[in-house]
Amino acid sequence: MKSLATETEQEVGKSIESIFVNCPDRIETKLENFPKYVRRQHLKRFLAMYEIFKMILRVKGSIVECGVFRGFSVMAWAKLSAILEPENLTRRIYGFDTFAGFPSVSGEDRTGAGSAEPGEFQTASYEELLELIRVHDQDRFLGHLP
């Protein structure tokens, strides 16, 4: 998919990456201080998910993420659940994805500059996500991800 970011926005991302890579701190220390490095748009996305999660705290049931891609949302839901409802025995977080991208795209799916292409959203993040889920469950009161 063609990037919708301006050239300046793309340069900001490269600058942040360079600062992150060149910082002498351990990676864990950098991650503990993530607001230093994360772009405003990505932090805003997480905060929006936080606000949505607060609205469903009293709603019983599971959370289903269709289209996991690299795992931002499914792991955010899991972490928000662990923080905001650590003793909820009934909430489960489910993520569904083929991780193979779109097998095909019809003309009706091509609606503008942000239109997807066959293979778009393919990612090799499945094994990484399984490992992150395992680690996440070791670091919380109750395991919510099967």
Name each model feature, range by range.
Residues 2-4:
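Leucine-rich tandem repeat or coiled-coil scaffolds
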Residues 7-40, 57, 62-146:
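S-adenosylmethionine/decaboxylated-SAM
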Residues 39-43, 47:
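Short, conserved micro-motifs enriched in small and acidic residues
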Residues 46-59:
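Conserved alpha-helix/loop element of class I SAM-dependent methyltransferases that forms part
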